[in-house]
Amino acid sequence: MAIERTFSIIKPDAVAKNHIGAIYNRFETAGLKIIASKMVHLSKEQAEGFYAEHSERPFFGALVEFMTSGPIMVQVLEGENAVLANREIMGATNPAEAARGTLRADFADSIDENAVHGSDAVASAEREIAYFFSAEELCPRTR
């Protein structure tokens, strides 16, 4: 098993509903360690930069508007197969299709406001982590 790092966002809808603690509990219960975390209110430019790969997609404008609608929590998770583990914890993108007990089934209202984001691969995790955190902000958990 490989120890990996992945990137996670608790989106504005879940932050507004005070689900941060419950979501962090799910990460930790699943064996993922939070090694960096902060609350950010994205500017339009920050959101457009983060989601640049989707800039030509029809939902891009609505995505940027949603992601700038309120504060978000960004965090770096570390653990065995962290990318896959976090994706399993999150559940399907559409909460109507997400398995019971997943974050999206429990905390999301729609495919557009689906509570959380998680990296889909180690390479994207590295890029997404670097977008929000400097190397000095990452605190490996040795105990």
From Swiss-Prot:
It catalyses: a 2'-deoxyribonucleoside 5'-diphosphate + ATP = a 2'-deoxyribonucleoside 5'-triphosphate + ADP; a ribonucleoside 5'-diphosphate + ATP = a ribonucleoside 5'-triphosphate + ADP. Gene3D superfamilies: Nucleoside diphosphate kinase-like domain (3.30.70.141). It holds the Pfam family NDK. Major role in the synthesis of nucleoside triphosphates other than ATP. The ATP gamma phosphate is transferred to the NDP beta phosphate via a ping-pong mechanism, using a phosphorylated active-site intermediate. Its EC number is 2.7.4.6. GO terms for molecular function: ATP binding; metal ion binding; nucleoside diphosphate kinase activity. The lineage of its organism: Bacteria, Pseudomonadati, Pseudomonadota, Gammaproteobacteria, Alteromonadales. InterPro entries: NDK-like_dom (IPR034907), NDK-like_dom_sf (IPR036850), Nucleoside_diP_kinase (IPR001564), Nucleoside_diP_kinase_AS (IPR023005). The keyword Endoplasmic reticulum does not apply. The active site is at residue 117. ATP binds at residues 11, 59, 87, 93, 104, 114. The gene is ndk. Belongs to the NDK family. Keywords: ATP-binding, Cytoplasm, Kinase, Magnesium, Metal-binding, Nucleotide metabolism, Nucleotide-binding, Phosphoprotein, Transferase. It is found in: Cytoplasm. CDD domains: NDPk_I. One of its GO terms (biological process) is CTP biosynthetic process. This is Nucleoside diphosphate kinase. One of its GO terms (cellular component) is cytoplasm. It comes from Shewanella loihica (strain ATCC BAA-1088 / PV-4).
